[in-house]
C-alpha cells in the first residue's frame, strides 16, 4: 500500500505572486495545481506493518511544534519520472523540521517499508508532463518574476493512503 506524510501549506491560487507565475508561464504546457498545497515529508511506496508506521506518527507528531518556513524561491526541477515540477521552495530548511523529517523517515525505513525518494522540500504548484519542454526555458521565465519572500507557520500534518483515506492527522501546538 502506498502512503504519504504531508504538512499542509496555506497558500492560495489567487495570491498575486502565483498569478504572476502563471502569467509568465502562460505559453508553457503547465497543469496548475489549484489547491491542496503541501510538502511531502515521506512518500512510502510499499508500506509494511501499518500499525507500526502509525505509531511512529504518534511518537514524533503528537507533541511536535509548528514550523515557520520562509519561502524565498520559485523554481523547476525534473522528477524521477521525467515530469517537470514548478514549485515554491526555500533556501533555508529549518533545522528542527529537517531533524523531524530525518527521524520519521529513518524509523519508517526500520519497518521494512520502502520510502520512494529523498526528501526535497518543495510545494508543487504545477506539473509539465510534455518531455519536449525545455527545463532551462521554464527556469528562465521563472527567474524573471519579482518574487518577494514570505514566512508561513505550518501546523497541520496528515498521514494518509495515497489518494485515499486519512490514517493520522495532527495540529502541531
Describe each model-derived feature in a short phrase.
Residues 1-173:
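Histidine-dependent nucleotide/RNA phosphoesterase domain, centered on the 2H-phosphoesterase fold
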Amino acid at each position: 500500500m502506498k502512503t504519504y506524510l504531508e504538512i499542509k501549506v496555506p497558500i492560495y491560487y489567487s495570491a498575486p505572486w502565483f498569478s504572476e507565475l502563471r502569467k509568465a508561464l502562460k505559453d508553457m504546457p503547465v497543469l496548475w495545481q489549484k489547491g491542496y498545497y503541501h510538502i511531502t515529508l515521506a512518500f512510502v511506496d510499499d508500506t509494511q506493518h501499518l500499525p507500526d508506521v502509525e505509531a511512529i506518527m504518534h511518537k514524533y507528531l503528537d507533541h511536535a511544534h509548528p514550523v515557520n518556513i520562509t519561502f524565498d524561491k520559485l523554481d523547476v526541477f525534473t522528477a524521477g519520472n521525467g515530469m517537470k515540477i514548478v514549485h515554491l521552495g526555500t533556501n533555508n530548511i529549518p533545522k528542527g523540521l529537517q531533524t523531524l523529517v530525518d527521524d520519521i523517515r529513518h524509523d519508517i525505513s526500520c519497518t521494512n517499508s520502502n520510502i520512494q525518494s529523498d526528501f526535497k522540500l518543495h510545494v508543487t504548484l504545477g506539473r509539465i508532463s510534455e518531455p519536449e519542454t525545455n527545463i532551462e526555458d521554464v527556469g528562465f521565465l521563472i527567474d524573471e518574476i519579482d518574487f518577494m519572500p514570505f514566512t508561513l507557520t505550518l501546523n497541520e500534518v496528515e498521514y494518509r493512503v495515497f489518494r485515499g483515506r486519512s490514517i493520522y492527522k495532527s495540529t502541531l501546538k
